[in-house]
């Protein structure tokens, strides 16, 4: 996923997601991703649920931390850049952590501090809309680690979901967290990631 964005692109795009976030799309991630995911979950056995209770905390002080299943392993995508990524042993179900830096936007520290979260999320939103890989892309808002986040939700043509959280933590850093995979896996991971993200490992 390309995350290098120019400041001009951010500023030009900022209005579109503001409009999007004020629409009824706010509820779509609950009604679309969650309902698809919950449908799959209703057929899961109790032994499978027990397995998901065994977790690990992964990440770094730079990128933040999340809780994921203990069986997941660290890996690096070819185009992953400096992301921290973990998967379930396949290239389908993946969690990604990163933090946006001023140099990625070609701006100064003071310009970075003045950015709005919606400017960054809008650029991601529009790039996904233009991609031929996705059949549906929409924006919403949610909470991750206690922070309000703009969320870019995507459904790939192969049925795989991609959920991207963009938010500003209390240390002034713009954070990037993404979760991709199939509904039966996301049903456990989505709330786990949203509830567990933290910028310091406890």
Predicted regions: what they are:
Residues 70-71, 89-92, 145-147, 167-175:
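Short, solvent-exposed coil/turn segments at beta-strand boundaries
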Residues 16-19:
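C-terminal motif of bacterial Sec signal peptides marking the signal peptidase cleavage site
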Residues 72, 173-202:
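Surface-exposed amphipathic alpha-helical segments
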Residues 1-4:
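Positively charged n-region of N-terminal signal peptides that target proteins for export
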Residues 6, 23-69:
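N-terminal, intrinsically disordered, polar/charged segments of Gram-positive cell-envelope systems
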Residues 65-114:
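Secretory pathway targeting signatures of secreted, lumenal, and periplasmic proteins
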Residues 121-169:
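Signature of long, low-cysteine stretches enriched in small and polar/charged residues
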Residues 50-57, 80-83, 143-153:
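Short, hydrophobic/aromatic-rich segments at coil-to-beta transitions
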